[in-house]
UniProtKB/Swiss-Prot annotation:
This is Orotidine 5'-phosphate decarboxylase. It holds the Pfam family OMPdecase. The lineage of its organism: Bacteria, Bacillati, Bacillota, Bacilli, Bacillales. Homodimer. The active site is at K61. Catalyzes the decarboxylation of orotidine 5'-monophosphate (OMP) to uridine 5'-monophosphate (UMP). SUPFAM superfamilies: Ribulose-phoshate binding barrel. The keyword Lyase applies. Its EC number is 4.1.1.23. Keywords: Decarboxylase, Lyase, Pyrimidine biosynthesis. It comes from Geobacillus sp. (strain WCH70).
Length: 239
């Protein structure tokens, strides 16, 4: 998984996805399929994207009792996607069960999907962490604790804000994947995410992968927006 860009397909239908991807017909993308799209289209959208040569992050954020997560992951592994995730808040036993399910469900000769854990959603503020979730630690402490649990459980990495990447790399190692949503161009609106950075800032902070959605999918010219993403990652933004 060398390409650091993951394009979030935040659509509710396969038709919208096909319309968006049409200009990319000769490009293999790394795309994210989330709840909205998967719950509407099911496994068919995964098969379609794979046939087009795209790599897939299936972003369903599983969080349930260990046995349920194990069986769910066993089924998802058969789709042969590249990356799946769980909520770290489910605990070590649940995360270990997720890996067991992936190992059991991965077809012979195939590589099991990478599995990462969500630490805290990028829509979660420090105030929300304390006042609504009743977590009495700082955001940084909470994220690091969850990342450590994910590593202890054998997971391949975490989903986190880019601002938390340096701390996670320090404590969990350079090989531990950091997948960072909340990526916006400098002139974009933040929308419902509060812990956001630009592509180049994420690179400087050491992110393994960045997830970017509306900045590309809602752009008037998605190809130009994707090229801008590549330029910003290199620190070569056009003026």
């Amino acid at each position: 998984m060398n390409d650091p860009f993951i394009v979030a397909l935040d659509f509710s239908s396969g038709k919208e996805v096909r319309t968006f991807l049409q200009p990319f017909s000769h490009t293999s993308l790394f795309v994210k399929v989330g709840m909205e799209l998967y719950y509407q289209e099911g496994p068919a959208i995964i098969h379609s994207l794979k046939e087009q040569g795209h790599r897939i992050f299936l972003d369903l954020k599983l969080h349930d009792i260990p046995n349920t997560v194990k069986r769910a992951m066993q089924g998802l592994a058969r789709l042969e996607v590249d990356l799946v995730n769980v909520h770290a808040a489910g605990g070590t036993r649940m995360m270990e069960a997720a890996l067991e399910g992936l190992e059991a469900g991965t077809p012979n000769g195939a590589r099991r999907p990478y599995c990462i854990a969500v630490t805290q959603l990028t829509s979660t503020s420090e105030q929300m962490l304390h006042n609504e979730l009743w977590i009495g630690r700082t955001m940084e402490e909470t994220v690091l604790h969850y990342a450590a649990l994910a590593k202890q459980s054998g997971l391949d990495g975490v989903v986190c804000s880019a601002k938390e990447v340096p701390l996670i790399r320090k404590h969990c190692g350079e090989a531990f994947l950091t997948v960072t949503p909340g990526i916006r161009f400098a002139d974009d609106e933040k929308n419902d995410q509060v812990r956001v950075v630009t592509p180049y800032e994420a690179k400087k902070l050491g992110a393994s992968f960045i997830v970017i959605g509306r900045s590309i999918t809602r752009a008037e010219n998605p190809i130009a927006a994707y090229e801008r993403l590549q330029q910003e990652w290199k620190g070569e933004e056009k003026k």
